[in-house]
Amino acid sequence: MRNPTLPKLTSQGLELDTSVESFGLLRNSMDVIEDKVVLRERMSEDGYLYLPGYLGRDLVLEARMSVTERLAAEGLTDPGHSADEAVAHPDSGLKFKPDLAHDNEPLHRLLYGGRMMAFYERFLGGPVRHYDFTWMRAVAPGYGTQPHGDIVFMGRGTHNLYTAWTPLGDIDFQLGGLMILEGSHRLQSLREEYLTRDVDEYCENVEGEEEYAKTNPDMHGWRWDGSVSEDPVELREQLAGRWLTAEFRAGDLLTFSTYTIHASLDNRSQRIRLSSDSRYQLDSDPVDERWIGEAPVGHGPAGKRGRIC
């Protein structure tokens, strides 16, 4: 069913049920931004905190400009439009472009200083460290991100770890922002199976698996891409809850736990959807070694780990 007040929304090419029973808007938590106790209670209850306007629009737009200028210089935007519009060059095929964060001072200032770090220090209650790797999304028109939880990509350190999804510009329903599956962080069925997995583990007792994991460049040597489902419509029907999203603006912050299932709407515009994922934890907690250092090993060969299957 479709809510008549909303446009047609799709994810993975599938039309979402936008009836009030299946779809909703994220809860705004700016009313309790100074109350760390309530913020923690809401994170525990909702699995996310949506903070519209918290980061400040000017700082975000400065970071956006640094990104769009690089895209234009690489010929990835349409030269018939200004770089800031980020109109996609035909067949650019963009999705994930972490090099946009390399030596990017405006972006690092936004994500790893000021109000962002102040928020996590207050929320977590102590000195905070961030992962050194920045996940930069530059999503061309087409499908968005499949449903997944972050823990399967970064679960070797503390699980008291939080993602900051930061829209680098205004993202309406057509451009297609992130969506959260309501209540998914509390589902025992996911915690006992899907959320215990690690995309970089391989079966060391199976012949050929170590070589495949460490040498096959296709999909980082994965046998599995970390998604919980390829079908966000069917997944919601199976797990219940609603898909929750918003029309985001530059300056908004959406943070969530590593157990929270999330995905994104498809990009049904002509523009590139720009956003970043960055991660934060207490400095005193153990950290996943794949994502720290000047050149994090990430999902490369050094990040693989064998187990007995």
PLM region spans:
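A structural signal for short, well-ordered beta-strand segments
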Residues: 132-133, 164-166, 276-280
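Short, solvent-exposed loop/turn segments at secondary-structure junctions
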Residues: 55-57, 136-138, 171, 185-186, ...
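Catalytic core of non-heme Fe(II) oxygenases with the double-stranded beta-helix
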Residues: 118, 145-245, 285-294
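Non-heme Fe(II)-dependent double-stranded beta-helix
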Residues: 2-46, 52-149, 153-156, 290-291, ...
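Short Gly/aromatic-enriched secondary-structure transition segments
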Residues: 65-68, 180-182, 270
